[in-house]
């Protein structure tokens, strides 16, 4: 094998030596391609696995933790929620519409593969500076393309996209982030797993035909960008949501039978990863007859068939004798279905082309025992330069308030979420635009499931460990503010180039923060994804661990809103304001800096707040609640009253007026009626949570907070109209 070919497959000299040892000979091109894909960062998690192994993954309500297509938790009365978040960053930067659309398609398949009907989608989007003279126009093009791709696929599939977050920073100028989350619901006893066992059991290919789209996608997603990357459009998969809709319905029909042993989505690295993962998990071997693959293009080679990432395809291990029944279901839905192999006990993948053996590879070294790297780490030098920066006001509070409310990181994103169908399936209780977590009703048990997606990259830049812990806490707090109990998380870890020791240090610290927060807050990790090499021309993104927290409220009718719908409601701030301006939005907007050093998270205070919100809501004491996030109480209150029908007369009583922009954790704003005040304050005392009265909601269409005064019309215009103008 010549060195150029090996290098083109991103295989290092050390890895090639391992390949020679595993095979006992030189690999052929097909084998090299398969091993390259399975050992890519995207499939093997070789740089990250050692840090992920420490995550807490168990709890009495966890049915399935990491290692399957998606995580599963018990949501009561025999029902389960199946969910996962993952990235489609690199393809979305190259081809925004197709990249984002297939990102949605992939995550939907991960969920319905487990036997669940998908009932909700969320997304976390990060773009570059839309005001930048050089790249602003291109960033707007990316925003429009990505949003169009997500809405097209989700809407056509009939899956409601009910929430998300969107942020802008120059660190994403060369690498945008597109993280998609899906949640499905099924009976706890009806979950299917990705396994291939039972010698002689048939392996069946189902779904769409295989083309040349997405070739090398897993390897591309395991590398950083440079000028040449702009020509990579052919490696972006093309999605067809209508085929996926048929595939989902066919799979859900199949799951009502007892015809199959296991099923796996063909995602990154296509047929390669699905076959190796199924056999690897089961300790089996497999024979695949590649010439039987349904092909969309003529003249395709075994190499292309094994590595194509054509969408809307699954691999099924059926029970022997039931092949025809399985095929019949997929034919009914107008999909391809063909027996293309069988399970063996050899522990090897045997690849045939017109009955000739063209590839023979041991499965375990490519799946369960793929190489794990221990990359060098070193603390980034920039941390010592930024840690002592202190924030002081340089303009009037009113000026800063207006500047912040119309900033694209804070203002309303109706331009985005209006493109998503959030009400299809008629289960949506609280969707995007209503602040905080999104909520759906579970008709089968009367409960609701709340979910929130969270990632503040600036905080992770300032302190990767505390920043990641804060993301877990913040996502959980948003769920708690709906009245639900946070139960588990899914994570999508977006970082730069792991070959840079400073990036690897950020990653290790981020994992430590997630591990600590999940343990202390009792929200285990049940699924996730790692996206590395988010780097262009040597510049890495800020560390960006996206966290989705999922919680349950036993009675959907008790779901809390985030808006004030009545006058004369008492407005309270819960939790302590500690003057946390490090990595804050106010610092970024006023000083154009991301600096400081974060305070450790007080987990006891965070948990006490969650417990208080849950108990107060169970006792019907609250009218509304919302987590205090970026921009502090100033922005939280502004947004709550912008989406409300009433005005506000509020006073913070802070000694220093800049404190209204403080971003301390473990805080929430609540609204409650005067007759419930005493009972609530007694409860807050019981839980050890400080409650500060800020004022009341009023019938006057006016917003007043300390020295800030605006008419409700001005407030609404700043919040609702700004982004539409900025994105044009």
From Swiss-Prot:
**Single GO biological process annotation from the record:** 'de novo' IMP biosynthetic process
> Which top-rank group of organisms is this from?
Bacteria
Q: Where does substrate bind?
A: 87-90, 109, 237, 309-311, 531
The terms under GO molecular function for this entry are: ATP binding; magnesium ion binding; phosphoribosylformylglycinamidine synthase activity
Q: Which reaction does it catalyse?
A: N(2)-formyl-N(1)-(5-phospho-beta-D-ribosyl)glycinamide + L-glutamine + ATP + H2O = 2-formamido-N(1)-(5-O-phospho-beta-D-ribosyl)acetamidine + L-glutamate + ADP + phosphate + H(+)
Record-listed E.C. numbers: 6.3.5.3
Q: Which residues bind Mg(2+) 1?
A: 86, 529
> Which CDD domains does the UniProt record give?
PurL_repeat1, PurL_repeat2
Q: Where in the cell is it found?
A: Cytoplasm
Give residues annotated as binding Mg(2+) 2. 110, 265
SUPFAM superfamilies per record = PurM C-terminal domain-like, PurM N-terminal domain-like
Q: Which HAMAP family match?
A: PurL_2
Matching entries from NCBIfam families are given as: FGAM_synth_II, PRK01213.1
Concerning its family, UniProt says: Belongs to the FGAMS family.
Its recorded name reads Phosphoribosylformylglycinamidine synthase subunit PurL
**Coding gene?**
purL
